[in-house]
Design a protein with these regions (language model features):
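Short alpha-helical interface elements
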Residues: 54-56, 73-74, 86-90, 113-117, ...
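Catalytic phosphate-handling regions of large nucleic-acid enzymes and associated NTPases
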Residues: 99, 112-114, 155
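Rossmann-like flavin
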Residues: 69-108
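Short secondary-structure boundary/hinge segments and terminal tails
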Residues: 40, 83, 108-111, 156-158
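Helix-loop-beta segment of a Rossmann-like dinucleotide-binding subdomain
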Residues: 71-75, 106-133, 190-192
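Residues forming the flavin
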Residues: 1-65, 101-103, 124-198
């Protein structure tokens, strides 16, 4: 069977679902997950989300993040993370995530890891679950986004050294999905670095 979409997204964690929600509503999007849509590491994450406290906090946020990564991070990527963090948290709030508030009704920022100031927003001790549930609800309300659960991404479809889709296996049936764009949001990024013994 062949299927044609504008965007094929492999993975239903925060990266995959948030990507789907940030695409143009006119695009036909297919999100593929190997299990149920809620069976992701996002759902299991307990901590919070780092966010710059304001424009003046961005340089310190960048430095804290670089230091935590032993300066192996790509500086440009860390700068984007820091600069866009406030807008992304606002968007998550607009989608319905109810981050914890302090006694004055403001976001309750906590401190984790290598951060030198309180800049972590959270929902109790189940931030990942809250984010996942909100994103799943939002994706399910978008008519241009289709979800394939219990579906395996087997391989990419390549033509002239360019990815033009993916081969899926669903209910023992092969589905060739042709897409203008393919987003691999499969998790496990931390495992791609060669480890050293110290």
């Amino acid at each position: 069977m062949n299927k044609f979409v504008d965007v094929l997204i492999v993975g239903s964690g925060v990266s995959g679902l948030y990507s789907a929600l940030n695409l143009n509503n006119e695009l036909k999007v297919l999100v593929v997950c190997k299990d149920k849509i809620s069976c992701t590491n996002t759902y299991l994450a307990q901590g919070g989300i780092s966010v710059a406290r304001g424009e003046d906090d961005i340089p310190l946020f960048v430095e804290d993040t670089l230091r935590a990564g032993q300066y192996k991070n790509k500086v440009e990527a860390v700068e984007v993370l820091a600069k866009e963090s406030m807008d992304n948290i606002k968007e998550l709030i607009d989608l319905g995530i109810n981050f914890d508030k302090d006694d004055n009704g403001n976001l309750d920022f906590t401190k984790e890891g290598a951060h030198s100031i309180n800049r972590i927003v959270h929902t109790k001790d189940n931030t990942g679950e809250s984010v996942a549930k909100t994103l799943i609800k939002s994706v399910s309300e978008r008519i241009n986004i289709e979800i394939y659960e219990d579906t395996f991404f087997v391989d990419i479809i390549e033509e002239n050294n360019e990815c033009i889709g993916g081969i899926l296996l669903k209910d023992e049936e092969q589905i060739n999905v042709y897409a203008k764009y393919v987003i691999l949001a499969t998790g496990g990024i931390g495992g791609i670095q060669q480890t050293k013994e110290y």
